[in-house]
């Protein structure tokens, strides 16, 4: 993408140079005079053509269907009377070139007595080769059609009862073009690595698991400075050390896909909330994390939130991995593991007084999002709404700080600051005169709107929750209400916690929580 823009801007600049006014002539005359020297227009056209070619063939982005409501790969019927009994992969990332190579093996039991076709999702940047069944080469094809960052690999398999399918794969993993403007998920470097599903090894699409699921063994070879963290309950162990300064890690899992993180991580083991927590963060953040009291913040949050709201649904009950990653958007969670956005733990974010009175309290705020935002999700489609994960997160942070430092500290650094910000909000010229806001240029309007929305979500909503606490009978009553909301039965079609859910649980109306 950088090459695309560099060539485009250089081409445009060259064209503008050709149009510099000469001999009192206008733009067309000056251009006609400049192009007499053939190399000038050739350079301009070459740069523009190079930009167009780079845009069309950029190696980092795939050609996934832009209509993300289409899920054709999930409509592929399962092979009849065929199960996968196990699978494995040996993965060799090149952290210098940013590429991946590997060998994958799949073992099937076919009781149909019929030949059949196995389907896999593969990263569009990978090339498939050396596909063999029980040692013999077999035909295969990779679709031109792509969706959700996958192309479909189809392999013709015989009617044999026991089948071992092996294949080699490798290349530069491409990003989904539908999210290419966001921070990349797939990354391969000596500092950080993330391989998800088809980026790790071809993902099996149309074969059901055997009686033991999809027993999986993954081996990955990386520089010795990197630690491997499977996303989930699996534990990775070093099984070999090579003379070239690399280590081979191995772990077992049970799924058709899988996600793996690796990097120059520091691990801290913390006991909190009845769980053993493995807290992983990048070595480059060590000074910031230690200054913010990260380990103490994790313990405080997990102890408090587990006692008041309940266990996280994505923990195993005994262990939980908290992994700092470069994922954007707040992270995600699965059985036994959860992500923390790297951007939440920068020095700039940890000094944001809107989230807490100091770096340690901002750390608490970000960790509380494991309960409000990840453990319970919020619909963020209405940007004008003051109801979001931030309201309950800021309120919970206030309660934890109040418990740790006392009511006076919490009142001064939280409630009083919320009230001051809300008072200023309703005195704001653009709040009192929204027509003037709409008349501003878009860039200025968005900047002001974002600032105003911040006040409503981070200050006004916590004040409303605090008022609700007083109306329902105090902190213990509010804790019971929030615990019930956190552990409620979710609607799979709309799993979000809404403002109306909160009001109903409190037995209140919107008018009851007006601050005026």
Q: For each of these PLM feature ranges, what is it?
A:
Residues 1-21:
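Hydrophobic alpha-helical segments
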Residues 28-101:
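N-terminal, polar/Ser/Thr-rich
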Residues 59-63, 168-264:
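Extended, low-hydrophobicity, Ser/Thr/Pro/Gly-biased non-transmembrane segments
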Residues 104, 109-111, 118, 156, ...:
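Zn2+-dependent metallopeptidase catalytic core
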Residues 115, 125-185, 241-248:
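A surface-exposed beta-strand-loop module
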Residues 148, 218, 271-381, 385, ...:
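Juxtacatalytic substrate-recognition/specificity segment
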Residues 287, 408, 454-516:
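Amphipathic alpha-helical substructures
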Residues 390-463, 471, 492:
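Acidic/His/Gly-enriched intrinsically disordered linker/tail segments
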């Amino acid at each position: 993408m950088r090459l695309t823009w560099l060539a485009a801007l250089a081409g445009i600049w060259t064209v503008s140079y050709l149009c510099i006014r000469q001999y009192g002539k206008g733009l067309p005359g000056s251009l006609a005079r400049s192009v007499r020297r053939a190399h000038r227009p050739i350079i301009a056209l070459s740069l523009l053509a190079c930009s167009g070619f780079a845009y069309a063939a950029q190696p980092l982005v795939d050609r996934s269907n832009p209509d993300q409501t289409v899920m054709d790969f999930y409509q592929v019927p399962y092979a009849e009377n065929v199960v996968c009994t196990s699978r494995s992969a040996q993965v060799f990332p090149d952290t210098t070139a940013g590429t991946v190579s590997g060998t994958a093996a799949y073992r099937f039991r076919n009781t149909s007595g019929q030949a059949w076709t196995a389907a896999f999702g593969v990263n569009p940047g990978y090339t498939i080769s050396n596909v063999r069944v029980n040692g013999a080469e077999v035909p295969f094809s990779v679709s031109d059609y792509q969706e959700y960052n996958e192309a479909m690999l189809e392999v013709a398999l015989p009617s044999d009862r026991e089948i071992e399918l092996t294949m080699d794969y490798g290349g530069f993993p491409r990003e989904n073009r539908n999210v290419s403007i966001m921070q990349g998920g797939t990354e391969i470097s000596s500092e950080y690595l993330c391989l998800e599903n088809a980026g790790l090894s071809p993902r099996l699409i149309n074969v059901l698991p055997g009686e033991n699921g999809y027993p999986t063994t993954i081996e990955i070879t990386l520089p010795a400075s990197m630690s491997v963290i499977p996303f989930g309950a699996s534990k990775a162990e070093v099984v070999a050390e090579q003379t070239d300064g690399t280590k081979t890690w191995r772990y077992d899992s049970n799924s058709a896909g899988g996600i793996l993180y690796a990097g120059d991580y520091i691990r801290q083991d913390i006991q909190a909330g009845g769980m053993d927590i493995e807290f992983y963060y990048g070595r480059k953040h060590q000074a910031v994390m230690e200054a913010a009291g990260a380990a103490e913040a994790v313990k405080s949050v997990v102890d408090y939130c587990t006692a008041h709201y309940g266990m996280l649904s994505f923990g195993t009950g005994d262990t939980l991995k908290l992994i700092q990653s470069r994922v954007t958007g707040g992270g995600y969670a699965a059985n036994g593991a959860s992500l923390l956005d790297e951007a939440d733990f920068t020095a700039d974010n940890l000094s944001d007084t809107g989230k807490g009175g100091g770096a340690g309290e901002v750390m608490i705020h970000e960790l509380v999002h494991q309960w409000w935002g990840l453990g319970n999700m919020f619909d963020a489609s209405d940007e004008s709404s003051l109801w979001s994960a931030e309201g309950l997160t800021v309120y919970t942070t206030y309660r934890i700080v109040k418990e740790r430092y006392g009511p006076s500290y919490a009142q001064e650094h939280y409630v009083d600051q919320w009230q001051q910000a809300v008072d200023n909000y309703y005195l704001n010229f653009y709040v009192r005169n929204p027509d003037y806001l709409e008349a501003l240029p878009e860039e200025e309007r968005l900047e002001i709107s974002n600032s105003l929305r911040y006040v409503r979500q981070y200050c006004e909503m916590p004040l409303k929750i605090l008022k609700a606490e007083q109306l329902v009978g105090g902190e213990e009553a509010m804790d019971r209400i929030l615990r019930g909301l956190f552990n409620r039965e979710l609607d799979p079609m709309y799993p979000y916690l809404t403002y109306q859910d909160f009001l109903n649980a409190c037995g209140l109306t919107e008018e009851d929580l007006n601050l005026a």
